[in-house]
Curated annotation (Swiss-Prot):
Pfam families: TP_methylase (PF00590)
Protein name from the UniProt record: Diphthine synthase
InterPro entries: 4pyrrol_Mease (IPR000878), 4pyrrol_Methylase_sf (IPR035996), 4pyrrole_Mease_sub1 (IPR014777), 4pyrrole_Mease_sub2 (IPR014776), Dphthn_synthase (IPR004551)
Pathway listed: Protein modification; peptidyl-diphthamide biosynthesis
Enzyme Commission (EC) number: 2.1.1.98
PANTHER family in alphabetical order: DIPHTHINE METHYL ESTER SYNTHASE, DIPHTHINE SYNTHASE
General function of this protein: S-adenosyl-L-methionine-dependent methyltransferase that catalyzes the trimethylation of the amino group of the modified target histidine residue in translation elongation factor 2 (EF-2), to form an intermediate called diphthine. The three successive methylation reactions represent the second step of diphthamide biosynthesis.
Cytoplasm found in the keyword field: no
Protein origin, superkingdom: Archaea
HAMAP family: Diphthine_synth (MF_01084)
Enzyme class: transferase
Signal peptide: none
Species this chain originates from: Thermoplasma acidophilum (strain ATCC 25905 / DSM 1728 / JCM 9062 / NBRC 15155 / AMRC-C165)
């Protein structure tokens, strides 16, 4: 049996009774240490709570299905920060397990995406699928990121941007925004990226939500983990909610024309 267990965003406080029971009765417990960033000491705290060792897994170990031979005859659990099936990696693991006749149980929990949409005050029907922003260089400059943002903007949709990790930290905000602006320049798109909402350390004690124009956001520093929304035209309710739920970094934040 393979249990893929989402532990949400609030550390041990997000673990349900069913999840606790599944972890406590597992023969082996592993933790995904790549796809999401958990609260400091999370794995150590869960280990103490269930009174058993938790072994960290790299991305390659998860993608290679290294835990499936054990799951064929033992009760194996994989801990995932957030929701367990938001990353393709975990659905691939689920697929391979089922293909091999291994039973799979999924334990849902809150993800950064659904939490961020609500906390920012955005309308869920106006939010597009997320894009991932990697660290770019002259040798690796994926303009598909800005193409997706433009298509979403043309449809009046906000684009969630998930920021790549370097040494378990998100790329710094200034670098991420500079990359997006350079993509916009190379594609000769005008004014696609104007207003942004940045959400830092959602559900952590030092949670921060910032809202404003990109030129003002470039001057800000936020702690990892964070993600952002490239905002399309805001409706009256969204702008009203953002004005109260977030900290404005711009003196005046004009609506998208």
């Amino acid at each position: 049996m393979l249990n893929i267990i989402g532990v949400g965003l609030r550390g041990t406080g997000s673990i349900t009774f069913d999840e606790f029971d599944a972890l406590r009765t597992s023969d082996f417990v592993y933790a995904d240490m790549y796809t999401s960033i958990g609260q400091p000491g999370l794995i150590r705290k869960i280990s103490a709570m269930i009174d058993r060792d938790i072994l960290p897994l790299t991305r390659d170990e998860i993608e290679n299905g290294s835990i499936l031979p054990q799951a064929a005859s033992k009760n194996v659990s994989l801990i995932v920060v957030g929701d367990p099936l938001m990353a393709t990696t975990h659905n691939e693991l689920r697929y391979e397990a089922m293909n091999q006749g291994i039973g799979v149980r999924i334990f849902e929990n809150a993800s950064i995406l659904n939490a961020a949409i609500g906390k920012a005050g955005l309308m869920v029907y106006k939010v597009a699928p997320p894009v991932s922003l990697p660290r770019i260089s002259e040798k690796f400059f994926p303009l598909s990121v800005i193409d997706k943002i433009k298509r979403n903007a043309d449809l009046g949709l906000h684009t969630p941007v998930l920021i790549d990790l370097e040494d378990q930290e998100n790329i710094p905000l200034h670098d991420a925004l500079a990359s997006l602006l350079e993509m916009e320049r190379r594609r000769e798109y005008s004014g696609i990226i104007r207003e942004i909402c940045v959400l830092s350390r959602i559900s952590f004690p030092d949670e921060k939500i910032l809202f404003g124009r990109i030129e003002d956001m470039m001057q800000q520093e936020v702690n990892s983990p964070y993600m952002m929304f490239i905002l399309s035209k805001l409706d009256d309710n969204e702008r009203r909610f953002l004005s109260l739920f977030s900290e404005s970094v711009s003196k005046v934040s004009d609506a998208r024309s």
